[in-house]
């Protein structure tokens, strides 16, 4: 499974570490990552992939949304195919 993950929220120490640790726990590989800070607002976009026989998209989504809620961040995940289709419009 290939997916795009976005993380947005108020800047705080350890955002990248929290997200990377959760992805590692889920056995999700970070293929590419980009982040920036805009007036104390943190934004990050990740390209990720994993074996969907081991972890469903729904389970990955639930785990990342839970992390987002606990960390006061908005974390969204989209299937790469959906993201690609949206970009073509």
From Swiss-Prot:
CDD domains: ACT_1ZPV. SUPFAM superfamilies: ACT-like (SSF55021). InterPro entries: ACT-like_dom_sf (IPR045865), ACT_dom (IPR002912), UPF0237/GcvR_regulator (IPR050990), UPF0237_ACT (IPR022986). It comes from the Bacteria. Pfam families: ACT_6. HAMAP family: UPF0237. This is UPF0237 protein lp_2508. It comes from Lactiplantibacillus plantarum (strain ATCC BAA-793 / NCIMB 8826 / WCFS1).
């Amino acid at each position: 499974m290939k997916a795009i993950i976005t993380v947005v929220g108020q800047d705080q120490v350890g955002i990248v570490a929290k997200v990377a640790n959760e992805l590692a726990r889920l056995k999700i590989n970070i293929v590419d990552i980009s982040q920036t800070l805009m007036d104390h607002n943190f934004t990050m976009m990740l390209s990720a992939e994993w074996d969907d026989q081991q972890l469903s998209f729904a389970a990955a989504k639930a785990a990342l949304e839970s992390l987002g809620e606990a960390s006061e961040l908005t974390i969204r995940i989209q299937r790469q195919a959906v993201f690609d289709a949206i970009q073509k419009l």
